[in-house]
Amino acid sequence: MGKTKNKSDWQIFLEDYRFYFETDFDWVTYLNNCLNSYPDFDIIKFIKKYGPECEKSFLSWQSKAKSDVYSELTNKIKKQQFSEQLIYQLVQLDALRTNYLIGSLFSDNKTQRKLLKRSWKNAKKEGYTKQEWLMILVGLPFEKGAYHKQLYDHSRQEILDLTEVIKKLYLKTETNNDKLEFAATTSKTTAQLTKTMPLNSSDLDKDLMEFSGEKWGDN
């Protein structure tokens, strides 16, 4: 008891971990095990439980992991392991998917909102979760009924940072005319990025109508 009296909860946890697993604690292994075994694992609660030392350790690991990912991505792009066309398509596809989802979820069109509501109702009847339904809308692959770990792999800031890495290294943005152009070091070919398109009553989403049970072309 005396040996642990002056130790923090985090220090005790690390010692117990080392004793039980016969190896030092590392965040990657621990998080992978927790997320695979306990889908409801909450990293925020875990950090709060073990205090400031745990938080400092986690933030240090997160910063290094992020740096390693960006470094690897930067090297791949600089070595042109990604083609210009692929980079453009990825950036454009991400923007189109995001715009589509926002436009669908928060449409000003009453008919569109009605179709969306019916679409979710039918998806729920078929046993899909709301997350799976949204992935269907934007065409993301998933396994029905599984724990969708990929939805939590990256924070909002990580996604924004990764997007900036690609844009700064490979693309240059002309904000005055909303164009994305390949950087001068690679190509001068200009690629137009489609803006968000409003969903008019005469331009309703065909797939959404079909998924909601409506027949395309009905008045």
From Swiss-Prot:
Protein name per the record: Uncharacterized protein MG210.1
Superkingdom per UniProt: Bacteria
